[in-house]
């Protein structure tokens, strides 16, 4: 079920305090074959690992697709009753429930993963609205250890920075969703308007936030993986923003683009074993969820060898 296209990926790290030379753990980058239904206009814009499965959030189709990466099959679909003008741009889990963030009308929603029932999440301050350039809230990541949520804004109004907001969790009543209290915001500089951050996820074992960053101009793309350290209280430390070198990430991206794959990478997640997954959104603009898309969805796996 895996592509023969195999790319060796090296993640570099070293300990300054011990004066050790760079360590070069060997990783592989693989294209996990998806079933044909994922080549419809599913426009996946977020992804979360939970219980050994991957939960795909569709930006414009009212469904969450549950995928088994070992079997390479869709386990089930979770229909959801989304509000009008909803654009699901990111998904995470917190205490056995799904949480999605909407871009067009900026809001966070709690989703029952068994029946798809939705409840609105109250935030102590309004989320930034979608800008005139079409940028808005793009990702959400929950930190269960510290009871925090991190919310990603793709680009600010002048397109010079991406922003990540930290919210603390306030428990809700039995029939209500949790609440989120705004605590802080950090900015991540962008070299120019062609750059953006498209998703985030928490790597709790390594106390860091993984960030998916990309450059796009015409058909050419550059892909990057970055990290921000999380302190013991759950606060993001922007001064620790670090590139995680992934050899041939960009080269592989442009090679797959010539094979009719969408390389608009919109979702990132990490499983309990430390395997990182990245997925693309294969449809721009309006979507006809039952029709084939011009490009195929791609699911990439970054794994230690």
Describe every region a protein language model picked out.
Residues 20-305:
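Sequence/structural signature of beta-propeller domains
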């Amino acid at each position: 079920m895996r592509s023969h296209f195999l790319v060796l990926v090296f993640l570099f790290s070293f300990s300054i305090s011990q004066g050790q030379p760079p360590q070069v753990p060997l990783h592989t980058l693989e294209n996990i074959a998806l079933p044909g239904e994922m080549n419809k206009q599913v426009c996946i814009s977020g992804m979360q690992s939970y219980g050994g499965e991957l939960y795909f959030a569709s930006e414009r189709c009212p469904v969450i697709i549950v995928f088994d990466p070992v079997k390479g099959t869709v386990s089930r679909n979770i229909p959801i009753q989304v509000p009008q003008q909803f654009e699901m741009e990111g998904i995470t889990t917190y205490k056995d429930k799904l949480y999605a963030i909407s871009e067009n009308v900026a809001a966070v929603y709690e989703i029952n993963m068994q029946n798809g029932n939705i409840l609105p999440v109250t935030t102590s301050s309004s989320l930034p609205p979608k800008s005139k350039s079409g940028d808005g809230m793009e990702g959400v990541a929950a930190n269960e250890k510290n009871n925090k949520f991190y919310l990603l804004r793709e680009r600010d109004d002048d397109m010079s920075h991406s922003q990540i907001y930290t919210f603390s969790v306030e428990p809700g009543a039995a029939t209500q969703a949790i609440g989120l209290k705004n605590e802080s915001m950090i900015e991540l500089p962008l070299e120019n308007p062609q750059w953006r951050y498209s998703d985030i996820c928490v790597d709790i074992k390594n106390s860091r936030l993984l960030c998916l960053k990309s450059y796009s101009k015409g058909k050419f793309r550059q892909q990057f993986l970055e990290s921000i350290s999380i302190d013991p209280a759950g606060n993001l430390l922007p001064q620790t923003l670090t590139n995680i070198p992934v050899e041939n990430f960009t080269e592989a991206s442009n090679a797959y683009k010539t094979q009719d794959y969408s390389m608009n990478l919109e979702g990132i997640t990490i499983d309990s074993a430390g395997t990182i997954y990245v997925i693309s959104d294969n449809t721009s603009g309006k979507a006809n969820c039952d029709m084939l898309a011009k490009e195929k969805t791609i699911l990439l796996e970054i794994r230690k060898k």
